[in-house]
């Protein structure tokens, strides 16, 4: 049916044709989403559908946070379309992960935030991780320690330092996200940081920092003078 097509638009304005001609960088978020969705719904062509979906979900960041089930609550989003969109968003999230053959160098809190921001800012639960570093501050690995509210009873020093010891690392960075988007440290965050810092001194593994990831924001406890 006609409402499912963009037949009234000149061919050079169609999202897919624009991608072929100018490249993906030239497309708006609405146009890229329209290519993924492929078809509109009754009364809306696919560009209008895409615009509405971005508006109702709060933009790309809001869209990325939704589960498949939550996506299907929006008009025009069936289970197949929701699953395809979620898979595309997940693929994009994974693509920002660094090439495992290239070890990033961490010289500042900004470096570690840049490394993990696009993945961790969208997580809907707290994930606590430990970054193991070489003597020249190359990332040797990032270990997942716990999922859920950060609590000193759940974060045992043994688990935090195990991978660092295995990798012969002499320094680590603590890392976790706040799903609320606000990276302000809680009293529990501070307690865990100090406890692990004390444990690191005993083991000879320095805790360089604890970086908390929010929604495109971060806080370094080192920069705050807490560590």
Swiss-Prot record:
Pfam families for the chain: RadC, UPF0758_N
Coiled-coil positions: none
One GO-annotated biological process of the protein: proteolysis
Keyword annotations of the record: Hydrolase, Metal-binding, Metalloprotease, Protease, Zinc
InterPro entries xrefs: MPN, RadC_JAB, RuvA_2-like, UPF0758, UPF0758_CS, UPF0758_N
Residues covered by the MPN domain: 105-227
GO MF assignments: metal ion binding; metallopeptidase activity
Motif extent (JAMM motif): 176-189
Origin: domain of life: Bacteria
Binding site for Zn(2+): 176, 178, 189
Family: Belongs to the UPF0758 family.
PANTHER family linked to this entry: DNA REPAIR PROTEIN RADC, UPF0758 PROTEIN YEES-RELATED
Name used for this protein in its record: UPF0758 protein DSY3180
Organism: Desulfitobacterium hafniense (strain Y51)
């Amino acid at each position: 049916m006609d409402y499912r097509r963009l037949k009234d638009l000149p061919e050079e304005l169609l999202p897919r044709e624009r991608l072929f001609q100018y490249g993906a960088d030239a497309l708006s978020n609405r146009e890229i989403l329209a290519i993924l969705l492929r078809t509109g719904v009754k009364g809306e062509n696919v560009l209008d559908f895409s615009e509405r979906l971005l508006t109702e979900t709060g933009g790309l960041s809001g869209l990325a946070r939704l589960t498949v089930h939550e996506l299907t609550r929006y008009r025009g989003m069936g289970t197949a379309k929701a699953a395809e969109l979620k898979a595309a968003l997940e693929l994009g999230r994974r693509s920002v992960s660094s090439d495992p053959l290239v070890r990033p160098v961490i010289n500042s809190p900004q470096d570690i935030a840049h490394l993990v921001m696009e993945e961790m800012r969208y997580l809907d639960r707290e994930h606590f991780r430990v970054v193991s570093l070489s003597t020249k501050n190359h990332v040797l690995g990032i270990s997942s320690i716990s999922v859920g509210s950060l609590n000193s009873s759940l974060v045992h020093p043994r688990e935090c330092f195990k991978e660092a010891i295995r990798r012969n690392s002499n320094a680590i960075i603590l890392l976790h996200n706040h799903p609320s988007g606000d990276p302000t440290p809680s009293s529990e965050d501070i307690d865990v940081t100090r406890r692990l810092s004390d444990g690191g001194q005993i083991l000879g593994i320095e805790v360089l920092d604890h970086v908390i990831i929010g929604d495109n924001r971060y806080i370094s406890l080192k920069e705050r003078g807490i560590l």
